[in-house]
Amino acid sequence: MTEAVLSYIERIQSGDYLALARAISFVENEHPLAHPLLLSLRPDHSIPVIGITGPPGAGKSTLVNALCESFTDQKRRIAVLAVDPSSPFNKGSLLGDRIRMGKQFNNPLIYIRSMASRGALGGLAEKSLQITDVLKTAPFDLIIVETVGVGQSEIDIVGLADMTIVVLVPESGDEIQHVKSGLMEIADLYVVNKADREGADSFATKLSRMLKQKSVDIPVIKTDAIRGSGIDELLKAVLSFKRSNRLALNLLTEHAWRLIQEKRMKDVDRNELRASLEEAIGRPGFNVYQFVEQHFSR
């Protein structure tokens, strides 16, 4: 372990947000210090990681903001990793932590990091797993990962979070289709947010009934994140959730599998691949599958 890496680890463990921010940037941007830093981490895997996902417009950021307020009222420290949509052109974040959670940004008990998904499938940023391990090295009591609001494709959150919360809203009724088409399988808890709106009670009842018909014992909690109603009940459910040893093993297996996949893909140069494709695509009978076989057999 180099002196620089040791210094960063010690500062992160002491709660130094500047060192934490730099370490995360190292990982996100594949800085030369990133790999030795990750090898030297001693993450505290007892820190719960809560994934919050759901369709666009469900009020996920407002809900996270309200949870942070309630949690820090207990003088406990929380980290929020907010994964934003990316521009397909510059791969940058289109939103931002200061806009979404400005009210909490100066609270010393809260660390907020926004990162772009950079086109990653499943609603998660490419380096979310590694960054979560960096956060687990700091003295937080809870970590929240809020993912891109793209509905059912956010299944990847299961490979990261100890508990997955799916946030829905009552007004259109279309959210039930989201539940049926994929989110059902990943939720540990459902939140019907914007519960002040018409139809919230019947929507929550319909959702609970559907879950019971499928013999699934998953809580449904109604919240109004703007006014704060239901937030204490939600936080209590989050803090009382018990992760099984089987789930912990599954999470670590998923983590290791993704790291191995990433390591295998590291030598694939996208620009070189594009140049090779540009040359090959003009040949008669071009076949992308044959191209890939030949590309990797070189």
Where are these regions (language model features)?
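Short glycine-/polar-rich loops that comprise or flank the Walker A/P-loop
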Residues: 76, 108, 160-163, 185-188, ...
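Long, well-ordered amphipathic alpha-helical subdomains in the mid-to-C-terminal portions
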Residues: 222, 233-298
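Alpha-helical scaffold elements adjacent to nucleotide-binding pockets in ATP/GTP-utilizing enzyme cores
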Residues: 94, 131, 156, 160, ...
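Canonical P-loop GTPase G-domain recognition
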Residues: 189, 195-243
